[in-house]
């Protein structure tokens, strides 16, 4: 989950809370101390990883970052910095909470070459379905977390010869984002990173190495 995501606590144990995310109804566990009271976010992180500062000064950088699409409540602004909770972040690393990109995947190259991590959803590692969901979330649109649920959610089926930018190609347990008639991008487990590939090459490679054929291609808009 990301900083600023809202959730409901389902149950508590000594050190853990079982929660359900409001974003996609995903259920999981977090450490009790890892959350704060509900706040209404005013801004969201628009860079891959935004540095956090103790004071509104570039000399007071902490060893912490907020990942892309995290949400904050801006308490005040001082120079080029914005205060959230008791920390500071550069204003240039944020967008207003209602901001939307004209092209939902326009910032996708932020994750190019980044580490593949099953279950990951941030700059330290991300999986294929999170790469899709994250950009819908950033643009204030719903998208399920898992590949099978994304396949069911996006209804409009497309033939390979009719693909367009922002279409999604689905295999069993895997999804890729179409960038153009010839290119796609995906968080690719076997290579352990987010890669741009030729579409035909990717289809053949996945069929050869994983024995998987395309299940469907879906339009997202």
Segments (PLM) and residue ranges:
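Boundary regions of SH3-family modules and the immediately adjacent low-complexity/disordered segments
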Residues: 3-8, 13-14, 20-51, 57-64, ...
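Hydrophobic residues embedded in beta-strands of well-ordered beta-sheets
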Residues: 17, 81-82, 176, 184-185
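Aromatic- and glycine-rich peptidoglycan recognition patches
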Residues: 94-96, 148, 156-157, 180-221
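Catalytic cysteine-centered active-site loop
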Residues: 115-163
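Catalytic nucleophile-His microenvironment captured as a short glycine-rich beta-strand/loop
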Residues: 168, 173-181
């Amino acid at each position: 989950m990301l900083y600023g995501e809202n959730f409901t606590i389902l149950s508590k144990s000594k050190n853990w809370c079982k929660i359900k995310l409001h974003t996609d109804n995903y259920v999981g566990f977090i450490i009790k101390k890892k959350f704060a009271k509900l706040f209404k976010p005013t801004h969201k992180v628009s860079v891959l990883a935004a540095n956090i500062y103790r004071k509104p000064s570039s000399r007071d950088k902490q060893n912490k970052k907020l990942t892309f699409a995290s949400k904050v409540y801006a308490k005040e602004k001082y120079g080029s910095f914005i205060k959230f909770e008791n920390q500071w972040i550069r204003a240039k690393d944020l967008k207003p909470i209602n901001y939307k990109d004209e092209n939902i995947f326009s910032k996708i190259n932020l994750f190019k070459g980044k580490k593949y991590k099953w279950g990951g959803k941030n700059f330290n590692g991300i999986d294929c379905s999170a790469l899709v969901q994250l950009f819908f979330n950033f643009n204030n649109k719903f998208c399920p977390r898992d590949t099978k649920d994304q396949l069911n959610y996006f209804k409009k089926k497309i033939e390979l010869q009719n693909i367009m930018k922002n279409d999604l190609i689905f295999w069993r347990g895997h999804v890729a984002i179409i960038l153009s008639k010839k290119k796609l991008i995906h968080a690719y487990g076997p290579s352990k990173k987010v890669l741009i590939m030729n579409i035909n090459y990717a289809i053949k490679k996945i069929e050869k190495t994983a024995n998987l054929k395309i299940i469907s291609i879906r339009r997202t808009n």
